[in-house]
């Protein structure tokens, strides 16, 4: 929204001829630029309405929780995406700038000088935005991304993402279009809108033409409007002086964009949603389950170490899988350290590539679906498909099999589905007929792949007899039930023993683990076939896993009840104090 007089939303004129900037730097975009603009607008100032450029510290919202920000929240409904995907939206904008020469996007945390609060910074060296481009970026519902290679399409990604992370953001950008160099600053502040009681979304912006020897302000309405927008920015942004504001543009270089998001949201406990202290090389979402449970089962610890769990709370893990193809000359730099891209398809075991054509015609090339077992199988039961759209991860580890079903355990796939449309938040796909056909096809792929390869990892295909040619045994040992061994036994240590337990163990070249089931031959093998014994072993193994799961759930329940008990005790203590205070008041009366 242009800072014209009809849109500015204020009638304040700021005195730019202050002594706060005594530096003689007259470089492009330097402090001298403000002095030249101050002298340009001196004749437009009205003494009775003049305000000093150095304003009081910005005011904060009473409520700092995103979910309790108020029903008049300026961002459209549907902005419910978690913080990590909101950050990914801003990374997408930088990736789209690769075609304009961008080589990096930096994501970091800084401290605001005014109140020492944390803020998020995103900076890229792309082509930047001219004044018109910045207005379109910060207005609702506009998108100039019509290319088949760019990721965004709805036009609200920047606004919804920044507002999901914090109440306020300020954008600095420099660009050159048609031989004209410009630099612009725009402020999208929910705090400003609420505190000043604005009925409309007022977005103050200032633009400067840096093509000439001395930078000049670009005036759309009047010099007073330009000055009023600057005053709003100085009052409600993290920067109180013109010099501080201009230094941010200098940090960009000749072209690029910097976005600073501040007044970050808090959770219900009054703690920042984003954690910057758990890992100095990462930005993390708070995982409450880690802090609630004192005793965690070993299997759960192993699951939490896998990237399928890690990417839900770690921005570095999420960013490493965010794009399918590796960048040639572009880096995502998180807190000063480049993110190493990762594709789980590169480490699948027994991998297969299946071609899928979603269209009835054969004019378009079929989509390749890579599928295989994770390297931790069968130790971890992680499964699902990482589905990308235009190189961007939309659904990580999408489980197409039924919940609780063992079929497909450990099977992971990767595909780029450009033939279906993502939802507005890029966290799912639209439920179209093409999507439903893809889901049905993926279920079939998992089923066929599982039936072909599951025996390699000691799983048994339901309804199919066990392969007698691959049934082997180990030396004599005390009979046990449901013994699990993640490592294969060397072939030279395996032999058949009449008195020992019969097991089913498959160990092929690509497998590193197997399931061993042992039964007592004297008590349990009479009148039972090998297939029945195998099925019984599987049932015992599944029951064991159910008990482990129940144990974890019960531990979580105990932890929650203990927490509720502490809260109840605290409430009782407060009520007791109130009752005692009332009793004293009545006694005094």
UniProtKB/Swiss-Prot annotation:
BP terms from Gene Ontology: chromatin organization; DNA repair; positive regulation of defense response; regulation of DNA repair; regulation of gene silencing by regulatory ncRNA; regulatory ncRNA-mediated gene silencing
EC number: 3.6.-.-
PANTHER family in UniProt: PROTEIN MICRORCHIDIA 1-RELATED, ZINC FINGER CW-TYPE COILED-COIL DOMAIN PROTEIN 3
Known function: Exhibits ATPase activity. Binds DNA/RNA in a non-specific manner and exhibits endonuclease activity. Probably involved in DNA repair. Involved in RNA-directed DNA methylation (RdDM) as a component of the RdDM machinery and required for gene silencing. May also be involved in the regulation of chromatin architecture to maintain gene silencing.
Cellular component, GO, one term: nucleus
Keywords assigned: ATP-binding, Chromatin regulator, Coiled coil, DNA damage, DNA repair, DNA-binding, Endonuclease, Hydrolase, Nuclease, Nucleotide-binding, Nucleus, RNA-binding, RNA-mediated gene silencing
Organism listed in the record: Arabidopsis thaliana (Mouse-ear cress)
Pfam families per the UniProt record, alphabetical: HATPase_c_3, Morc6_S5
Full protein name: Protein MICRORCHIDIA 3
Gene this protein is translated from: MORC3
Region of interest: Disordered: 1-33
């Amino acid at each position: 929204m242009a800072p014209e007089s009809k849109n500015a939303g204020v009638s304040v004129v700021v005195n730019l001829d202050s002594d706060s900037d005594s530096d003689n730097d007259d470089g492009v975009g330097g402090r001298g630029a403000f002095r030249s603009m101050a002298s340009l607008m001196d004749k437009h100032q009205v003494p009775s309405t003049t305000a000093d450029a150095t304003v009081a510290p910005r005011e904060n919202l009473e409520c700092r929780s995103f979910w309790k920000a108020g029903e008049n929240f300026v961002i459209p409904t549907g902005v419910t995406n978690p913080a990590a995907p909101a950050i990914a939206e801003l990374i997408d904008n930088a990736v789209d700038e690769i075609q304009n020469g961008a080589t990096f996007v930096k994501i970091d945390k800084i401290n605001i000088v005014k109140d020492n609060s944390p803020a998020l910074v995103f900076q890229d060296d792309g082509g930047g935005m001219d004044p018109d481009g910045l207005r379109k970026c910060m207005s609702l519902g506009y998108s100039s991304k019509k290319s088949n290679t760019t990721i965004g399409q709805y036009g609200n990604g920047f606004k919804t993402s920044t507002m999901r992370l914090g109440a306020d953001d300020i954008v600095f950008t420099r660009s050159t279009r048609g031989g004209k160099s410009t630099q612009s600053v725009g402020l999208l502040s929910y705090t400003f809108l609420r505190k000043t009681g604005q009925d409309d979304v007022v977005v103050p912006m200032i633009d400067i033409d840096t093509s000439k020897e001395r930078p000049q302000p670009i005036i759309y309405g009047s010099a007073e409007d330009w000055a009023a927008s600057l005053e709003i920015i100085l009052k409600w942004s993290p920067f109180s002086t013109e010099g501080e504001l201009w230094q941010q543009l200098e940090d960009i270089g000749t072209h690029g964009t910097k976005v600073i998001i501040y007044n970050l949201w808090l959770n219900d406990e009054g703690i920042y949603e984003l954690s910057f202290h758990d890992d100095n090389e990462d930005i993390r979402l708070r995982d409450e389950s880690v802090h609630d449970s004192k005793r965690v089962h070993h299997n759960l610890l192993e699951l939490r170490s896998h990237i399928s769990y890690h990417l839900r709370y770690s921005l570095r893990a999420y960013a490493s899988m965010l794009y399918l193809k590796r960048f040639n000359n572009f880096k995502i730099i998180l807190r000063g350290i480049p993110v190493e891209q990762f594709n789980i398809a590169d480490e699948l075991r027994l991998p297969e590539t299946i071609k899928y054509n979603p269209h009835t015609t054969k004019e378009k090339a079929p989509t390749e679906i890579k599928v295989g077992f994770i390297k931790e199988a069968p130790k971890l039961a992680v499964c699902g498909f990482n589905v990308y759209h235009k190189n961007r991860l939309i659904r990580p580890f999408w489980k197409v099999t039924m919940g609780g079903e063992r079929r497909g355990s450990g099977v992971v796939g990767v595909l780029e589905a450009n033939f279906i449309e993502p939802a507005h938040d890029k966290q799912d796909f639209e439920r179209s007929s093409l999507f439903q056909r893809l889901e049905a096809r993926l279920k079939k792929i998992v089923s066929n792949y599982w039936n072909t390869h599951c025996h390699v990892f000691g799983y048994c295909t339901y309804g199919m007899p066990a392969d007698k040619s691959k049934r082997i045994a180990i030396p004599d040992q005390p009979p046990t039930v449901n013994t699990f061994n993640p490592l294969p036994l060397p072939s030279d240590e395996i032999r058949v023993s009449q008195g020992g337990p019969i097991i089913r163990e498959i160990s092929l070249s690509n497998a590193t683990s197997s399931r061993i089931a042992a039964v007592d031959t004297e008590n349990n093998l009479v009148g039972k076939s090998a297939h029945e014994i195998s099925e019984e072993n599987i049932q015992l193994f599944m029951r064991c896993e159910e008990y482990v799961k129940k144990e974890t759930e019960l531990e979580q329940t105990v932890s929650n009840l203990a927490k509720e008990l502490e809260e109840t005790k605290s409430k009782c203590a407060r009520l007791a104090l109130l009752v005692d205070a009332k009793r004293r008041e009545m006694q005094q009366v």
